[in-house]
Amino acid sequence: MSSSAPSTSAPTKIVIPDLVSHCTIPVRCNRHWKQASVESKRWLFRGGNLSDRKRDAFHGLKAGYLTSMCYPLAGYPQLRVSCDFMNYLFHLDNISDEMNDRGTHGTAVSVLDALYQPHMHPTSRVGKMTKDYWVRLIQTASPGAQQRFIETFDMFFQAVTQQAMDRANGVIPDLESYIAIRRDTSGCKPCWALIEYANNLDLPWEIMDHPIIRGLGEAANDLVTWSNDIFSYNVEQSKGDTHNMIVVVQNQQGLDLQSAVNFVGDLCKQSIDRFHYLRENLPSWGPELDREVEIYVDGLADWITGSLKWSFESERYFGKAGLEVKKTRVVALLPRRA
């Protein structure tokens, strides 16, 4: 009796983990979301610098919907600034994917100059956009939130520049190094500062630097980022992009594709569990500060559940098939581009 040889053909699909069922945090959405979404896209498109194809992609992106689930209690002015930043951040992500490390560095200089010196008059498009939302943000953001925003956005550009160098040199980092740099390339950390801004919080550094508060931010960042690596894997593999945890795990541990997807999915579930554990063990700083901390941690939770819901309703990862993928969890792999 002969046995057939195991198949060595390339996989044609992956089954993504069920992270939605593992996340029991309720979804909330800001009542101003439609108006803020429309006006924010109009702001992004101002000047006609985007092609019709890129404009269509931003309509399908639904960044305003994501923002509205992540900052559900924000007043309209704060939500609008947050929507502008989110559209702008996705715009930066798109253009950084097309840049080498020199181009990324030039963008970083334009952005950080506008943040550190808002009285100056930027000449680049990205510098002007940066100044535009920043001068609105600093009208009501606490000094601590402003400082945390600038510092973490600076870290974002340092990490994105390193990512561009790795991409140019064909470097796939080990898992530990990847996790460290991905926590900054995600862009989540400045979004955590926006939680303070959007909710008019004024949290002191001794609270924001507390190990449990930092751990909660890290757990939320990990879930948002690592789940994004799963959801974006198909598009990225079609372009040959290796800055993805699934590729890193395959390379380091010698796993097949589906096993690597499952591995990253387990890490995502562990990050949700870690968030809940830390949330249940928050210390007390007195009634007034405890209320502000509760609002901040709720904001991190909104990011966890909002990002999961949005990932299937946006067209960024699964095109028009997001809700079908959410139901079946099966993703047909795209062919590699020549």
From Swiss-Prot:
A UniProt-annotated Pfam family: Terpene_syn_C_2
InterPro entries to which the protein is assigned, alphabetical: Isoprenoid_synthase_dom_sf, Terpene_cyclase-like_2
Positions of short motif NSE/DTE motif: 228-236
Key words of the record: Lyase, Magnesium, Metal-binding
Motif (DDXXD motif): 93-97
Enzyme class per UniProt: lyase
Enzyme Commission designation: 4.2.3.-, 4.2.3.125, 4.2.3.126, 4.2.3.127
PANTHER family registered for this protein in UniProt: BETA-PINACENE SYNTHASE-RELATED, TERPENE SYNTHASE
Recorded family membership: Belongs to the terpene synthase family.
Role: Terpene cyclase that catalyzes the cyclization of farnesyl diphosphate (FPP) to various sesquiterpenes, including alpha-copaene, beta-copaene, beta-elemene, alpha-muurolene, gamma-muurolene and delta-cadinene.
Entry protein name: Sesquiterpene synthase 1
Naturally occurring in which organism (per UniProt): Postia placenta (strain ATCC 44394 / Madison 698-R)
Record gene name: STS-01
